[in-house]
Amino acid sequence: YTVSHGVDPSGKKVGNGFSKYIVTDLLRNRYGYNGVVCTDWGITHDYSSIEEADGKCWGVEALSIPQRHYEALKAGVDQFGGNNDKGPVLEAYRMWTAEFGEKSARERFERSAIRLLLNIFRTGLFENPYVDPDRTEATVGNPEFMQAGYEAQLRSVVLLKNRAGTLPASTRRSV
């Protein structure tokens, strides 16, 4: 949902999910991240009304949906948030093949597949794919876990604009 203005040395003004500088140059190369990169939700979609828009394809609005997928893949993205349609992804594969060749396309898609599958292997879903209903019932919705999650969310709140003078917080002021 974000565009990091003035950050990309190329001057491109695109959403971060379409930015090779953000995803590959910074996140992967500079900071060494090798996990899955999933786009913000719905940034490859077209929307006919603001009510249905959950993401925006900033900077690539003029591109087709398959072209947006292709641009995100070239940026280094592995997974498309909010997209359950394989069509644009397969078309992006064909675009990659046309530009860089079949070998390069396979290598690029396999790199993403490895990252995605590693998460499934690490959780043991291939070794033991069966759910233990008793254990699940004790875990899912566990009040202690829900409280810990809620507290983690409270600690992760970020103030983007300080228009109302919220910060610095006074010890005598309640928020």
Task: Locate predicted features.
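Glycoside hydrolase catalytic-domain context in secreted enzymes
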Residues: Y1-V175
